[in-house]
A protein has these predicted regions:
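Short, intrinsically disordered/low-complexity patches at protein termini
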Residues: 27-29, 91-93, 211-214
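Internal nucleotide-binding/catalytic subdomain
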Residues: 1-69, 73-76
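Generic "edge-of-domain/loop-turn" microfeature
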Residues: 13, 66, 76-78, 134-136, ...
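Active-site "cap" helix and flanking loop/linker of ATP-utilizing ligase/carboxylase catalytic domains
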Residues: 35-57, 72-139
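Short acidic, gly/pro-rich beta-turn/loop elements at beta-sheet edges
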Residues: 4, 16, 79, 137, ...
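Peripheral (often C-terminal) accessory segments that flank ATP-dependent C-N-forming ligase machineries
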Residues: 98-247
Length: 247
């Protein structure tokens, strides 16, 4: 088995929902998470007798250790918008190109490293766009601001003029995602902060006049998010330097 990327889902509270996707962060192959997850996933593949082709698995870290959520006999999803970033981080290859090499050029495939490089060749991550408002979109000035960011690689969205936007509470109400990558990690973080502030300021869209554009109560006082959470506060079951997992 070869591991071409390992990700941590960034899930947080927003708009009264306890688990909203804010993005995916690649993690170093020498990180504490990767040292647990990579051998675990390879053990799952062996147990399932999967020897050929790409796979995409999801693991939840619990107080009892890693727990398998799913194992798919396919490449990582997202319409492949992550491929340019992974190639940049890995130095020229991705799960897609590795799969092609496995079938078309075995010599090249076997020459690929056992797992992704440490450290990465650049900094990168996927930012899922979160809506704190609702209404009918008139224009999307925030898209051009995002496209001009130094670390911008790709914007994927189906939200445009005429679209109905609602509060983001799950993957289906996300307004899009942005792939960011830059050789300077501080630049990427600066751009990410800019996007998050645009979300909170409702600066990505201009809404139609005459439509009651409603703002999420969380944007008025982000510290009060817990007051709108559904059910009991989640309990931390695993914490590392990069991620906290709740149950």
């Amino acid at each position: 088995h070869k591991t071409t990327m390992c990700w941590v889902y960034d899930k947080r509270q927003a708009n009264g929902s306890a688990f909203v996707y804010f993005g995916l962060q690649p993690i170093d192959s020498e990180s504490e998470e990767a040292k647990i997850v990579i051998p675990y996933i390879r053990g799952v593949l062996d147990a399932m007798e999967i020897k050929h082709g790409p796979t995409h698995g999801e693991v939840m870290m619990t107080s009892d250790g890693p727990c398998l959520v799913e194992m798919n006999c396919r490449a990582h999803g997202g319409d492949g918008n992550w491929v340019p970033m992974v190639r940049g981080l890995n130095g020229g290859y991705s799960q897609v190109s590795a799969t092609i090499d496995a079938y078309m050029d075995p010599t090249r495939f076997h020459a690929l490293p056992d797992k992704m490089p440490s450290p990465f060749k650049a900094a990168g991550q996927e930012c899922c766009l979160v809506s704190y408002s609702k209404g009918t979109v008139k224009s999307t000035p925030g898209y051009e601001v995002i496209r001009r960011l130094p670390s911008f690689v790709y914007l994927e969205t189906r939200t445009g003029p005429g679209s109905e936007v609602d509060y983001t509470v799950d993957p289906f109400t996300s307004i899009g995602s942005v792939i960011l990558m830059h050789e300077d990690k501080s630049q990427l973080q600066e751009d990410l902060v800019r996007i998050r502030q645009m979300e909170k300021d409702n600066a990505i869209f201009v809404y139609e006049k005459g439509v009651d554009m409603m703002r999420s109560p969380s944007t008025g006082n982000l510290s009060s998010l817990s007051g709108f959470a559904i059910g009991d506060r989640p309990k931390t079951v695993f914490t590392s330097s990069r991620a906290s997992v709740y149950w």
